[in-house]
């Protein structure tokens, strides 16, 4: 993933759908979520499958915005509001949302070792 530049926002959410893994209902939900990419201002959109046994979440969504105004516009967009109300809230069992912006730069010695 490219480095997040000053002023940009990375919106991420990890989640577990309430549908059975691999089910048609799960696939339909993910297809509906993929349409969020079409909302103006959304960049670098990805739907990701969790591979680590370190948590119980099954998927992640990541996207970027040019700035806070673009992110606010996305949050208020009718398609996003509709998706959250009609699909997300009734079909997601658990989730964690985290929004990032660039922080202090550290040298290589601080970024080695992973998390």
Map each language-model feature to its residues.
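Short loop/turn motifs at secondary-structure junctions
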Residues: 41, 91-93
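Short, flexible helix/strand-to-coil boundary loops that buttress conserved ligand/catalytic motifs
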Residues: 75, 84-87
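Short, conserved catalytic or adaptor-binding loops enriched in Gly and charged residues
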Residues: 36, 87-90
């Amino acid at each position: 993933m490219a480095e997040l530049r000053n002023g940009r926002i990375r919106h991420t959410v990890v989640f577990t759908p309430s549908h059975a893994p691999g089910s048609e209902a799960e696939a339909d939900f993910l297809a509906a979520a993929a349409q969020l990419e079409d909302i103006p201002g959304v960049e670098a959109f990805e739907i990701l499958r969790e591979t680590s046994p370190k948590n119980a979440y099954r998927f992640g969504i990541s996207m970027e915005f040019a700035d806070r105004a673009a992110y606010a516009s996305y949050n208020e967009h009718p398609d996003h509001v509709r998706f959250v109300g009609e699909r997300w809230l009734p079909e997601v069992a658990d989730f964690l949302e985290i929004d990032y912006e660039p922080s202090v730069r550290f040298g290589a010695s601080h970024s080695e070792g992973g998390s």
